[in-house]
Amino acid sequence: RIDLEQFSDFSEQEEIVMSREVIRQYILHLHDIYKQKTVKRKIASLKAFYSYLEEEEIIEDSPIRKVRTEFREEKVLPRTIPYSTLEMLLSYMYSLKLQENNTECRTKLLNRDIAVVETLFATGIRISELCNLPQKNIDLEQGIFCIKGKGNKERYLQIGTVQVLEQLQEYKRQWEIELNQTEFFFLNRFGERYSEQAARRMVKRYAELAMINLHVTPH
């Protein structure tokens, strides 16, 4: 909300639909006063807002869609994501939960997606390990995950972040019926094990929607 109010103040207009030139000038203004991760978050908020207006048919076309935004990305090791980028990705995903037009099914899948991303980066586990996680190996009360790696070697991971645990608990509550019919913890919309390919596609899709210009590939 603060990000949208700031955009409104900058444009000095009350109309919902701004010209692409106004948006372009606003983005340049953001680059002058904020760090890159803050600029990305504010742009993501604006993109989510106009996406909502399109879905509600309040506007026909999002004015921000064709506005090019370029960032000098942080240098990172292959297959890793800098913290600032991860923060922006999750910020965008959480902002989608606030949209008033979310259906029950959409909210359910969104909570699953956020739980997957939070777990991947809170634990650092491989995507294959996450997709194969059995429910019996997860203790959300203690925040402990038991991961079986190569050679059936077990390792224990502790999640100490309250936000991550709360998101996992919310996911578990919403998917209780499906979870009672399988051993796996992360499921697809049909109640089956969430596949590695689907998880990678999901992360890539949100990264593109949030205008992250990195090749986001959790290992």
Question: What residue ranges belong to the model's regions?
Answer:
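Conserved catalytic core of the tyrosine transesterase superfamily
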Residues: 1-219
